């Protein structure tokens, strides 16, 4: 159950970088959209959306912004037909990358994603070419844990699949459909995650050479900045000396 989680360190570092870049709202809006897309716009019947709304409110997001994101995901915006599209490909150093998009113009999105891959030395692959290297999971990250035993007991009682400890931090893994329920149960037990989301998690990380690190980081950043992109995940394991 316990063990060093290099992924947690990488994920948490990325979360801090995202905050510095002012991407918190973007990520919250995307989660509202995706949650509504998969579970509908009724927060009473959609625990993942309920959690996303709670997070957005905590960051003082306006009601209008939240409602538009939810309607966009649920397909309730007049005259707008949204389509989910997934792209898979490889970046420098053989890094596997999955890009999930929500778009009203598939041709535009394909062109933008392909351009990013091409410009940064990557290649788009066919459907399924890298997906087998990832698993969808709910992830809850705790930065400072005072009582590991209590957290482990609460997590397992809430239905978590696994929990990994690394020094004072902890990473709890759940099935995607149990993510919101586990989160809410842990809050009731007195544990609130510092970071949490449903994401694709690489089964194994792929080492990035120092020579390729900057280009891989640039590719991931370019993809994340595209308007139609909902999420970008990779199995990149950047060298410690890389400061990108």
From Swiss-Prot:
UniProt-recorded Gene Ontology molecular function terms: DNA binding
InterPro entries registered for this protein in UniProt: Integrase-like_N (IPR017856), TACO1_YebC-like_2nd/3rd_dom (IPR048300), TACO1_YebC_N (IPR049083), Transcrip_reg_TACO1-like (IPR002876), Transcrip_reg_TACO1-like_dom3 (IPR026564), YebC-like (IPR029072)
Pfam families xref list: TACO1_YebC_N (PF20772), Transcrip_reg (PF01709)
KW ATP-binding (keyword) present: no
Cellular localization per UniProt: Cytoplasm
Cellular compartments per GO CC: cytosol
Biological process according to GO: regulation of DNA-templated transcription
Superkingdom classification of source: Bacteria
Keywords linked to the UniProt accession: Cytoplasm, DNA-binding, Transcription, Transcription regulation
UniProt similarity note: Belongs to the TACO1 family.
Entries under PANTHER family matching the protein: TRANSCRIPTIONAL REGULATORY PROTEIN YEBC-RELATED, TRANSLATIONAL ACTIVATOR OF CYTOCHROME C OXIDASE 1
Protein name: Probable transcriptional regulatory protein DNO_1179
UniProt organism field: Dichelobacter nodosus (strain VCS1703A)
């Amino acid at each position: 159950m316990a063990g060093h989680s290099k992924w947690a360190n990488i994920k948490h570092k990325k979360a801090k970088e995202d905050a510095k870049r002012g991407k918190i709202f973007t990520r919250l809006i995307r989660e509202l959209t995706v949650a509504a897309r998969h579970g509908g716009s009724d927060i009473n019947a959609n625990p993942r959306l309920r959690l996303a709304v709670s997070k957005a409110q905590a960051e003082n997001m306006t009601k209008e912004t939240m409602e538009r994101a939810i309607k966009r995901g649920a397909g309730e915006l007049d005259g707008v037909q949204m389509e989910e599209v997934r792209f898979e490909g490889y970046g420098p150093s053989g890094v596997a990358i999955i890009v999930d998009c929500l778009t009203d113009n598939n041709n535009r999105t394909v062109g933008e994603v392909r351009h990013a891959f091409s410009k940064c030395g990557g290649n788009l692959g066919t459907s399924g070419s890298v997906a087998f290297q990832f698993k969808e999971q709910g992830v809850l990250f705790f930065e400072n844990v005072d009582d590991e035993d209590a957290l482990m007991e609460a997590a397992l009682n809430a239905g978590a699949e696994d929990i990994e400890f690394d020094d004072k931090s902890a990473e709890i893994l759940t099935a995607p459909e149990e993510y919101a329920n586990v989160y809410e149960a842990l809050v009731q037990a007195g544990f609130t995650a510092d970071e949490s989301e449903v994401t694709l998690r690489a089964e194994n990380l792929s080492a990035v050479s120092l020579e390729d690190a900057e280009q891989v980081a640039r590719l991931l950043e370019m993809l994340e900045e595209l308007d139609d992109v909902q999420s970008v995940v990779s199995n990149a394991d950047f060298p410690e000396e890389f400061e990108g």
